[in-house]
């Protein structure tokens, strides 16, 4: 029989689901005492090369309030050609096409190995993919040139029938006509005036006179084919023209006097982009790709004035309510994000500058629409160029690894309700019997819209057990959840992916050991971290840390083995032993610690809310590898005791790859030993972490910042700030101390944290 660890991994590979608990407490009261909520990390479009889509539509439950999809957990009467829904127990007739089914001739959706299945929907018109570039021209000459080259390169990666458009902005905003042969023509808008969607569409000539009964008909893509084709053209038609147009783009002509910032109308440019797509291609897969090299400095959405002597807001300003433009700008971008999400479009933000660019205010544009957020120093760096190129990578079938306009519908058995979701989604406000009144994350609904998805996009979905304590579930009972994802595939097909899972119920009084053994501490750490980061958006940082600490203490009290008032007796089983360590590193992470970070570090939170379990764990607790002459590279503790003079360290934090040379290694390299034939093994030692780093850099999206440093180097701070400070300037000379690098910090170490946790867990006062 498979261990729980193997069971968890098999389910993740097959269904893209990781639950915090894999045996569920059978009553509401007991579930609340488990501290960590019943929740899962769902990767709706997890890549499955072994899962070809079926070319027919799913069979749905006939009950209007259910509509669950036929799945392997349903009971089937093959003689009567009936099936019973495992969610509402409605008996349903099979459609005529299923007349030949039997125990030995089952459709794929009834086979146990197809707990996840994908359907291709044949009906409905297919729409091309749409890419609308929104380009900042207030860049330095070399930055603008590099960006133009990247955009020209991207045209060759788009499908020939994809529609593409171009908006440029500086002090003014220009919407470029692409249907003109031989001449450049554009519509120019003032960057200071906020325009409604109707005004934008009227000015661009996208509306046509109202006709009787016109309002009753839902908008269809390409309702005004001529009007929209002036601004959005198939790549194969305008490849050469647009390449030339991009090549001719000049820096914003308005002069910038000394001591001033360029006037940058980002808010108006985005508003026009949203209005253009809203009027021409509602409910069609589209990406608005914003490239900006500085903060918006005029018009709606501005985050700082043009006077350089007045700095952009800091966390200190925000705490003191001294960020003059922040609330108004955030409101503007939230309004745009909600409109974009309602139309099924997504907004990507590519912000490359040495100073802040206003990501704090603009973050909702990417967060609510499932768009990408990329932050760099310059468009002329390999970090941006390679990250941008990776957006257009293809899967094993030659299709883009991106999907559009998805809706996620979650169905549960009667003992469960849905509390909410955390991830790149917006609520569709679909109430129903399976929706909980207690919200966690984006709640009050059983359906969410995810406008931009890729194979690693992951949502945290939280549930509530509602079965009462006095109505026991029969022995061997199982709870079920179904995830139904409707989306537009990058091949323009409409598809539905259905994942149906079940887990055993258990009585906590008699089967607590089973529940404990089925605890997934990695998934639980990420799910609790997402809750903490979600709360940090609206609560004070210290309050969030206190909440996380309280939850950790309660969990240790519930599942630890100890004698009252005796910290030395405290033990956690293997299922829980790593969880406190994850919480320790989470408390020190940039997701919760804003000190010494700029407000644009909301970039980190953006990625944490959308990455899968493996990448999220790396963000919480970076991986550290050690290279030495004594053997192959090995993972070592993320601890200052691992920093040794004769070692090379490779640290992966997800956002950075750091190679650190110990003191002796750095001296040998300076002496040039690697160039001497007799020290070839030293040359290989220096090369090994570089090769491994290259492998990570090639696979990661977005591409991490690459840092090569050594003992005493200024960039060694990236490593020193992450390791557990077991050796500091305060305890450096403690008796029996291992050799290692002391960290100059007053932060508590993991050992002190654990000692304090044990004291509180065994205390009867807590």
Swiss-Prot record:
Presence of the UniProt keyword Transcription regulation in the record: no
Any single Gene Ontology cellular-component annotation: endoplasmic reticulum membrane
Main location: membrane
Membrane disposition: Peripheral membrane protein
Residues involved in Zn(2+) binding: 61, 66, 85, 88
Post-translational modification N6-acetyllysine, affected residues: 564
GO biological process, one term: COPII-coated vesicle cargo loading
Gelsolin-like repeat residue intervals: 633-719
Location of this chain's protein in the cell: Cytoplasmic vesicle, COPII-coated vesicle membrane; Endoplasmic reticulum membrane; Cytoplasm, Cytosol
UniProt keywords, alphabetically: Acetylation, Cytoplasm, Cytoplasmic vesicle, Endoplasmic reticulum, ER-Golgi transport, Membrane, Metal-binding, Protein transport, Transport, Zinc
Entry's Gene Ontology molecular function annotations: GTPase activator activity; zinc ion binding
Residue positions, PTM N-acetylalanine: 2
InterPro entries per the UniProt record, alphabetical: ADF-H/Gelsolin-like_dom_sf (IPR029006), Gelsolin-like_dom (IPR007123), Gelsolin-like_dom_sf (IPR036180), Sec23 (IPR037364), Sec23/24_helical_dom (IPR006900), Sec23/24_helical_dom_sf (IPR036175), Sec23/24_trunk_dom (IPR006896), Sec23_24_beta_S (IPR012990)
Quaternary context: COPII is composed of at least five proteins: the Sec23/24 complex, the Sec13/31 complex and Sar1. Interacts with SAR1A.
Function: Component of the coat protein complex II (COPII) which promotes the formation of transport vesicles from the endoplasmic reticulum (ER). The coat has two main functions, the physical deformation of the endoplasmic reticulum membrane into vesicles and the selection of cargo molecules for their transport to the Golgi complex.
Family to which this protein belongs: Belongs to the SEC23/SEC24 family. SEC23 subfamily.
Protein name: Protein transport protein Sec23B
